[in-house]
Amino acid sequence: SKDSAASTESKDSAASTDFGSTVATNDSNSSSNSTSAINLRTFSRLATTTFAAAAATSTTNTYTGAGTDTNYNIPIYYKLTTVNNGTSMTFTYTVTYDNPATTTVERPTALSNSYAIYNTGTTNQTMFTLGSAYGTPSTATSYITDSTGAQVSNPRANTTNINKQGSGYTWANGYQMNGAQAKQGYGLTTTWTVPINSSGDTSFTFNPYSTSVTGGTNFFNGQKVTVTDPTSASTSTANSQSASTSTANS
């Protein structure tokens, strides 16, 4: 069901004309297996690539979940996409009020234009952990994406250091998305790449996080993505909910 406080329109017709590079898509390579208690579907749009020289296969997995913006009592969503090409893994994480499971653009009209959110916690918040097969991540780049997932040109992207935190990693929460952007169906996206060693544990965990820039509780309230094998279809767990996954292999 749609949030009564949000207006909707077709995502195909609502694509922004103000964006930079666009990620290539190949929907024909996607398959979706939903086990979500809230009937969230996930999808994988990143085209897979076979690296002939290394005889490696690129694997794309997408994990989604939903929370509640407790300041306005409306749904908010996260989407985490991983692309593993055998030598590195790229993580792309988006927080948005536009439900990724639908073909319409949900516009949270209740939001104040000046209201703003982060997609990460403080420096004390562990965002993700990595198994022994991974190298050390160095930087994360944050930017605003439109409802198709394309990066918009304004505001400009910002790159910050990834820091060790506890048993995992985090990045600074200075980049934000405001209500005016959210009401266009936009999302707050951060991406980072981690090298993969030849052997070892390739599991990882991810802790989705979002809150108002003025502080408060995590809108995703303890949800966690746990993946043991990122080269095959995996299931994320979020409390009693189970987010669906999609895998594209070539």
Question: For the regions a protein language model found, what residue spans apply to each?
Answer:
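Intrinsically disordered, low-complexity segments of exported/surface proteins
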Residues: S1-S250
